[in-house]
């Protein structure tokens, strides 16, 4: 054990050396530690950082056979023995520090000044009235004013004293310094102008000026024009001695002399009289009314209410004061305002023995009760009608009685005397033989086409002039 310690001590002295020159920490460090290359040995070399060569808390890192110092706190040099005057940076307000020998110099910016750039041209703020200070160059500044203030330090207010005349209101303007808002009637940069002085309106018109430097004239009744220079009654528009006066709304009215009318008294509506048949003309200003004598009517009494006779069927016409101007006295049973309604012959009950009377407006017919016949149902029927008594036609067949015999007209699908036999005969209308909207009707052994208006022929295929009667075949 003692032998090993001796060998270690000998190796330490050999590797590190004992005659290292001394150095002053305040001087430039030119010392370079030697690089030792010991001969191969079975013993490991000693770490060069064990003697802590790095000053002021520098961190030592071995590098091959030597070491390297990583300095802290503004120190530099191979062994961190030299001091950097700019670390830490003592210059204020983000200014740049420049080392000068063992001391330093501050390069100021943004309006800062002083040894450490600790002062600023905008602190305290030299701008008055809430003006905003901005550094200008190294030692200068610029004030951005607000609220209508101007001047190098915002010490002057643009609206004090008020430059606006005639009760105009002053408002600060960032472009021109101020702006005037004039009351009605005044205009100009300082509200010094009034368009109504002197008054440009003639004939007692009232002038009203606006804030834009323009004016308008309110004219007295009867006067008009941009400056009330014209009069509605000059020259006089009323004819035939009519008197002109203003209507109060920019126009005129004419007071006409007797017998004349119209807007300018040019018309005498009753001369010559427009009323005929001794009717009396009444002047209504620009119009007239005719008062007609009895029996005449119309706007000019030119119509005789009874000529031509409005009463029909030999009725007699009499003038009266009704809305129509006449009244009809009907004869022969006719009725209505103009005797147009014919008498109903059924009112006299011409059908006897329970017969029913039917009137179509032209003639009447009697539908007799069973057992009676004739025009007025006065003749007895000696042979009973089997169509009524026994109803011989079956299956919706139609019974036809001619007074002597009957026959059955069977419905489609049935045949025989009494329509009791089924018939498989094809319906002739199934093929739609009738053209142009014609209506097909089965007639037992054939069919009949009832043509629409304007067509004719068996199949309604022929065009024909319009007729009130439809053709059947």
From Swiss-Prot:
A GO cellular component annotation here is: extracellular region
Q: Identify a single GO molecular function assigned to this protein.
A: calcium ion binding
Organism, as annotated? Mytilus galloprovincialis
PANTHER family named in the record: CYTOCHROME C OXIDASE POLYPEPTIDE VIC-2, UNINFLATABLE, ISOFORM C
**Record PROSITE patterns:** ASX_HYDROXYL, EGF_1, EGF_2, EGF_3
State the post-translational modifications.
Contains L-DOPA (3',4'-dihydroxyphenylalanine).
Instruction: Enumerate the UniProt keywords alphabetically.
Output: Disulfide bond, EGF-like domain, Glycoprotein, Hydroxylation, Repeat, Secreted, Signal
Q: What is this protein called?
A: Adhesive plaque matrix protein 2
Q: Which residues carry this modification: 3',4'-dihydroxyphenylalanine?
A: 23, 31, 36, 43
Q: Per the UniProt annotation, where are the glycans attached?
A: 93
Which SUPFAM superfamilies does the entry mention? Answer: EGF/Laminin
Q: Which domain of life is it from?
A: Eukaryota
